[in-house]
């Protein structure tokens, strides 16, 4: 496979941007080799600058649930862009998308739009503290909530991929108020509440972990967190930047039947454009300026292009049978991956929920980040390179979930499973 142009472009990029990328995981540090430079995307496919075509299971890290460059989304954006790219003023499209989010997500009575998932989590952290008058927060090992200082403690995503314990430049005084517990461990959370009476503002988590690989909540875990937070006067926050509108139209909270106090969102609700949002109970959201004293603002928040793409994407997702199709596609894929690994004699554990999946190259089950570390990262790197050579683009990290879309066909899934079978046979 010729990737000479990708190599040249990435080589030049390293003198222009730190590590040659705008986000660390894209640099292929944990899988080896040089990253592929994309030229265009359409449906379930991506083409690099050398003309190689790939079946894509990253989907821009989650937003492309309808497939890349969906014609109805593109058409809506073409019409909207003629009216301007950013207003910096109230826009009727904000009302439309806000109503759609409020109608869909059980916890959301009011919503504030921002520009990224990180920004949403930063704001919701401040809101938790403002509403409760408490400074401490509980997060879970391996869960990633963006790159804000207080969250870079035993975090997932690129932090996990690069094996970093945290990040230089984060003051100890900032992280002193961040308490951590193993995912799926209610007893550890109980102990933290007991050790910090009347000091914890809330608990924030990915209801399905997607930034330490793919880890599902065990039965009773989310329900237990809901009870513990209520008992201790703390807030429960679901980071649904990844799971929102992907696991179901109402997100993971609708899927599992557990309603948090606050929710952060992003990715899908922007239809591929930069976006984030946080929302929840009206009495809490009324704390946000200008309605209340907790300040948060953004120049490009609620911009008409992101709102337009989000509205059209949610309209497409609301059509009958959408999530049944996504679930069937993803279940077939992960089943085929596990079968192919078994045929090659490799240990594997994994699963899927709706349009989100993942696997670890180790014996299961994997219930938390510590157990996820048992995955064979070196073998995954070889697998990743072998899959690229066979035209399949997976996340360049053993610690990232994968995503399917409405555009992935049965033929795409079959071709992908065959590529896994061939790759497992050659990687050793």
Swiss-Prot record:
InterPro entries: 4pyrrol_synth_GluAld_NH2Trfase (IPR004639), Aminotrans_3 (IPR005814), Aminotrans_3_PPA_site (IPR049704), PyrdxlP-dep_Trfase (IPR015424), PyrdxlP-dep_Trfase_major (IPR015421), PyrdxlP-dep_Trfase_small (IPR015422). Keywords: Chlorophyll biosynthesis, Cytoplasm, Isomerase, Porphyrin biosynthesis, Pyridoxal phosphate. The keyword Zinc does not apply. It is found in: Cytoplasm. Its EC number is 5.4.3.8. It catalyses: (S)-4-amino-5-oxopentanoate = 5-aminolevulinate. One of its GO terms (molecular function) is glutamate-1-semialdehyde 2,1-aminomutase activity. GO terms for biological process: chlorophyll biosynthetic process; protoporphyrinogen IX biosynthetic process. Pathway: Porphyrin-containing compound metabolism; protoporphyrin-IX biosynthesis; 5-aminolevulinate from L-glutamyl-tRNA(Glu): step 2/2; Porphyrin-containing compound metabolism; chlorophyll biosynthesis. CDD domains: OAT_like (cd00610). One of its GO terms (cellular component) is cytoplasm. It is an enzyme of class 5 (isomerase). The modification N6-(pyridoxal phosphate)lysine is found at residue 267. HAMAP family: HemL_aminotrans_3. Homodimer. Belongs to the class-III pyridoxal-phosphate-dependent aminotransferase family. HemL subfamily. This is Glutamate-1-semialdehyde 2,1-aminomutase. The lineage of its organism: Bacteria, Bacillati, Cyanobacteriota, Cyanophyceae, Synechococcales.
